[in-house]
Amino acid sequence: MQNEYSQFEQRKRDHIELALMPANQSSELNPFDHFSLVHEALPDLDFKDISIQSIRFKKPVEKPFIISSMTAGHSNALEINYRLMEACSKTKWAMGVGSQRRELTDKQAAFEWTPLRRDFPMVSLFSNLGIAQLIDTPISAIQRLIDTLQAEALIIHCNPLQECIQPEGTTNFQGCWTALEALVKKIASPVIIKETGCGFSKNTLLRLNNIGVAAVEISGVGGTHWGRIEGHRANKDPIRQRTADTFRNWGIDTLQSTRNAISLNPSFEIWGSGGVRNGLDAAKLFALGATTVGFAKPMLEAALGSTGQVLTQMNTIEYELKTAMFCTGSRVLDDLKEKACP
């Protein structure tokens, strides 16, 4: 078991290093540059009156941003997550934690969150578990993950391509829909479904809407591509390496995935993420109808430096969003919906 934990920690460290490599970014497929907002030369408003307030789980929130789930369960995670949570405590951003899978078998792993929650009790956090683990995990154990974190909601992440290419991948997803539907019915916390860089089809989103999930985090193609990352890790497995190269552009991009969701007029909230690198990208997602926007790689890069760098990144994104709103004559986020170029 100890050897398994050592391998787990090494895999998580690999993920951090590889996630920052340009080769593992599907930025050449990023759609944001091909989507524009209508410029307003005479915006009849005062910049200081612009509001970026949004709604999350039917309640108003001051900031419409989250740090998308990244890393947990290894020795380097504590410092990274401390900086991220410290910054969130100052900006009122929310945060999805990395996978809590290890906590299911290692009781000590849960103590990672004790000092973080002690120092930052007011930060809105979301628990996180993979769909493959959900299938075989009792609801009571999942509830413990939420309780340990004092989480506002639970993220279930879906990563079929990553699991196929990861040397240690879990590729048995049979029963995932049944398990997900049971979870939504039995657990009190809001359930968020998140992809990990490959986006969502309209049919999948329709099924998610029918079972009553609270939110879908799009995480489409255009940002960090986990198929590419696992291909780099599978350097002793030529079959997985070649497969990673074949599927290097696999998935549905963030804007198309968001449009797929909007077209359904769903009951779930649409959270835009996947290749979002600045506040202008965020503005475009709000214009399409997202109510929350998530950032991962930009925050990870900053958190490897300092809390100050994370705060600078957050403040810049907020200012860029407000600049996009001012230059389109949008006083509130909903106004952006009328400013998308046809």
Swiss-Prot record:
It holds the Pfam family FMN_dh. One of its GO terms (biological process) is isoprenoid biosynthetic process. InterPro entries: Aldolase_TIM, FMN-dep_DH, IPdP_isomerase. Its main location: cytoplasm. Mg(2+) binds at E163. Its cofactor is FMN; NADPH; Mg(2+). Substrate binds at R11, K12, S99, Q100, R101, Q162. This is Isopentenyl-diphosphate delta-isomerase. It comes from Legionella pneumophila subsp. pneumophila (strain Philadelphia 1 / ATCC 33152 / DSM 7513).
